[in-house]
Amino acid sequence: MPFEYSPLTAGYIRLITNLSVSSSPSTGDDKIKCTLDEVDLGTGPNYNCLSYTWEEPLYQKYLLIPRIYKDVQYPIECNGQAFSITENLRDALVEIGKSRGGGEDLQRQDKIWIDAVCIDQKNEEEKIIQINMMSQIYANAQNVVVWLGPEMPDDPGCESALRVMEVLSQILPARFKTAVLSHLGNADTYQNLGIDFISKREWVCFGAFILRRWFSRMWVVQETFFAKNFIIYCGSNILPWSQITAASRALKETSLGSLLNEMMEDRDRTIREQSTASQYTSNPIANQFRFHEYKNQVSPLKLERLLADSRYFGAKEAQDRVFAVLNIWKPKWDRADAEEETASFIMKSSIPVEVYERASIVAIRETKDLNFLSLVEDKKWRRLSGLPSWVPDFSAPPVWTPLAGHPRLAKSINRWDAAAGLTFERPAETNSYHLLPVKGLPIDEIVDSAETDLNLIDEHMIYTLLEVLSRYLESANFPGTSTTDRFEAFWKTLIKDTFLGEPAGPKARKAFPMIIVHFFRELDYELDGLRKALENVLNEDETGTQVKRISQLSEIYSQTQVLIGKLSASDDSIIPKWEVIQKAIKMRNDNGVYPEDMHEDVVNIMESFDSAYSCRRLFRTKRGFLGISAQSLDAKDVVWVLAGAAVPVVLREISSTGNWEFVGEAYVHGIMNGEAAVGQELSIFLE
C-alpha cells in the first residue's frame, strides 16, 4: 500500500520513531521499518535532525574502487505502508539504525527529523511552510546527525583524512599568517607550521574527503549554524566535529588550501584528467569555518556578507543561495513585523533573477551605501541570464577579491572613500527594482587597456602592461606630472596600492621589479622547454604546433625586451634593466630558487599583484588616470564616482535607453579619497 500523508496542523512537524534495521537471512538485504508521528514543535520535543545530501555523496575521481550510485528509489516500511527513498538516505538509515542503543547518549536516535520523509514533498504549500520552519527545527534539535556517505576502501576507517585533520588542528593561530609555506612536498612547510609531515597519499585521501558533497551543500550552512551538537557519520565511523572545524580554519587562514589546489592540479595533469582546481578553489571544508565563526560574532550579521559567502557553496536551485541564509540573517521566530515584511518581499518570487534582485535591494538598504556593487563579478563569470548589471550573480564562483573589502573593514581603518562629500539616498523597497537609481559624477573616458590576468599568464603578454605605461609616459594630455609620478601611478595601480595588507611603501617599491622578472622568467622557461622538446619530437603534427608556438613566443620575447630596454632607461628602479632580469633568472635556474631576499620579494609582490589584478585589467583614461577594473571594460567606458561607493566604478552608457550598465568597481590612482568628487552630481539609472 503506497504511503499517504495526513495534513499537518500549523506549528507541527513529523518525526521518525521506532527506526529498526534487520537483514534478510536469504538475500542479506537490509529491511528498514519506522513510524511517523506528528508533534507540536512549540512543546519542545526531544529529537535529532539528519543532515545529508539528496544526491551522490562521494567525490569519485580519486577513488580506486568507485561506488556506483543507481538512480532508483529504495523501499522502506513507514507506518506499515510502502515509502521510497534514495540510495544515500537508505545507507544513512542503515548505519543510524544499527547504532541505536549505543553506550553514548549522542548515538541513540530515538526520534529523528529527515526532510525527505517528514515533509510531504508533493505538497507545495506544506513544503513552503516547513522550509520556513527548518532553521527552528534544526535549532531545537538535541543533535544534528551528519551523514557524509559510506567509508571507502581507499581510506579504511577514514584514517588518513582523520590524521590530516588532527595534524592541521595542531597549528597555532600565531603561525597562520606568519609561516612561509612553499610546497606540500617540502619538509620546511611543516617545520614552519610546527606540525608533522603529511604525505601526498594522505593529502589525496583528505582531498577526496573534503570534496564529499555534504561539505559544499548550501543548506548545510543553515543546518550547521543552528545546530547545538553534531554526530558526524562517515560509514560506521563517528568523527569529531571539533577536528573538522579546526582543519577548516587552518585551510582558510593559511595558504595550505592554495597549496592543496596546486598539488591536485599537478596530479590531474600527470594522469591527464580534467583539472580539479576549480573544485578546490572553494575548499568546501575551509568554507565551513566561514559560517561556523558567525556563531560567535557579537554584531548583527548583514545580509550582504551572508550573500557573498553563499558563493562558496553548491546549490541545486540558484535561489537557495538566498533562501538558505535568510534565517541566519533574521531568524523567523525572532523577526519584528518590518523584518518579516522584508523577508516576505525577498521570498515573494522563486525565480532566481527576481530573488537576487530583491535581495540586492534589501542588502543595499540595510548597509545604507553602495559598496554592495563591489560584489558584482565580471560578466564573463555570470551564470544567470537576465540579471541587471548591478545585481551580483551569487551562483558565480568567487574568483576575485572585491576592492571595497569583504568582509568589510571598520570605518576607522577603511582606506578609501572616493565619493567623500556626496550624499547617498537609499533605493525604495518596491516591485519596480530592475533599475537602480544612483547619483554621482562622471570622471573620465577610458582610451587604452592592457590584457587580462589569464593572458598575462598563459600567453606571456606582460608587454601589454608595458605598452600602456609607454603610451602613458608619452601622452601630453596631463601636464604637471613628472616621470617619477607616472611610474609611481603605474606600479601602485597594479597592486591597488596595497602590499602585505598595508598601503604600498618603500618595501613594495623595492619588490615591484620582481613582477617583471617573474613574468619574463615564465616566458623564458616555456621557450626553453619548447626548443628542447623540438629536439625529440615524435610526429610531424607535433613539430608544426611547436614551431608555431616558438615563433609566436619569440616575437613576444622581442617585443618585451625592446619595451624593457626603453622603459628601464627612464626608471630602472621600477622596470629593471635587461641584464638585471637575466642575472635574476640565471640565479633562479641554477639554484632552483631565487636567493632568500629575492624569493621573499617575489612571493609577496606576486600575492599583491594577483589579489589586485585577478579578473581585472589595467586601463588609461583620456585625461591621464591609470586604473584597474573588470576585464570586460572597453574603450569609451566611463569612470564614475557614485554617492555611497567607497571606490570608483566603470559604467557603460546604453544608447537605446540613456541608462547605464555597471561594468565593475575600480581602483583609479589619485582619486581614491574624494579628490574627484567635486561638481554637480548627476542622477542616472543602472540597468
Residue ranges of each PLM-predicted region?
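A short alpha/beta connector and helix-capping loop motif
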Residues: K122-M152
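Active-site neighborhood segments
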Residues: Y74-E87, C118, I129-Q130, A141
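Low-complexity, highly charged intrinsically disordered N-terminal segments
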Residues: T53-E55
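Acidic/Ser/Thr/Pro-rich low-complexity tail/linker regions in eukaryotic proteins
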Residues: M1-L36, L41-N48, Q60-I76, D91, ...
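Amphipathic alpha-helical interaction segments
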Residues: I96, R100-G103, D120-E124, V145, ...
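A conserved hydrophobic secondary-structure block that centers on an alpha-helix together
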Residues: K111-I114, I119-Q121, E125
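Active-site palm subdomain of RNA-directed nucleic acid polymerases
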Residues: E77, Q81-I114
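Conserved, non-catalytic sequence blocks in retroelement Pol enzymes and Pol-derived host proteins
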Residues: L41, N79-F83, K98-S99, K122-I128, ...
